[in-house]
Amino acid sequence: MHLQHYDEKNNVYFITTVTKDREPVFNDELACQLFINLLTYYKIKYYINIKAFVIMPDHIHLIIQSLGEQSISDFMKMLKGNFTRYYNEIINKNCHSKFQRGFYDKIIRNEIQLNEIFHYIHNNPVKRGLVCDPQNYHYSSYKFYYENDSRFKLLLM
């Protein structure tokens, strides 16, 4: 059954999207960089505010806010579809989708919930045993907020 997404301008959402068959697509640094580049491009095109993110080997968590007229569903469709297209052109020449259909979205209703999800996202690599400290995980917004690392400044501003 297809779940309805609640697209309302200015709402803040916790988004999770999972790779097809939980394939660890994002163990590849080039795949991570490609996703970051596309996320930055579509953030600008769709007027999306990216508040936090983590790219795990087999899934991605985002906290986003739509500021424009396009839906979150359209944003995710373009992001995932074009990632698959460019991934297949550049990295792996098969034509298969890299993501499961759809995505999970949850409206964040208050600051307490936002802080809990923010913490959850940044600690996901620790929870999964990928690093001992979130500051050691490269594809996360953690360092931007806690260490003034400017690597993802364009994405997060």
Give the location of each predicted region.
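Short catalytic/metal-binding and nucleic-acid-binding patches
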Residues: 1-157
